[in-house]
Amino acid sequence: MICYFLVVTINFLKEKTTICHYFVNIFSLFLFLFVFVFVFIFVYFFYVILFYRFCSLFTYFPANSIWYYLSIINIFFPLCFFLYENFTGRNRRKCSLFCLTLIKITYTSPNHGFMVTGKEKFEKLRD
């Protein structure tokens, strides 16, 4: 989110657009975040209640730890920003690359649990 504010501000200063255009971008960001929070709570409810047993195979963290919740946000937040940037066409090149980089780090980091199968998790816990 901070990156988005910086990119919008830099584009505002660089392109010398009107102040109205700047606030429209910021307002659209807050509107998007409101929708994102609503959708995230809805998805999170079903994620925990309905798919907890299946999805817990893909994370190292216990379900009651803060890292478990942060790992879920780490996937949804950059992905939603990437979709938002591509659908609206705002700052497409800069923010989309940033968001894709976050998603790539999330999915490929060796210390992160999302690329680990249930069998490997069980073997790691056993050791």
Curated annotation (Swiss-Prot):
The keyword Membrane applies. Glycans are attached at N86. Its main location: membrane. The keyword Transmembrane applies. It is found in: Membrane. It is a multi-pass membrane protein. The chain crosses the membrane at residues 29-49, 63-83. It comes from the Eukaryota. One of its GO terms (cellular component) is membrane. Keywords: Glycoprotein, Membrane, Transmembrane, Transmembrane helix. Required for survival during stationary phase. This is Stationary phase protein 3. It comes from Saccharomyces cerevisiae (strain ATCC 204508 / S288c). The lineage of its organism: Eukaryota, Fungi, Dikarya, Ascomycota, Saccharomycotina. The gene is SPG3.
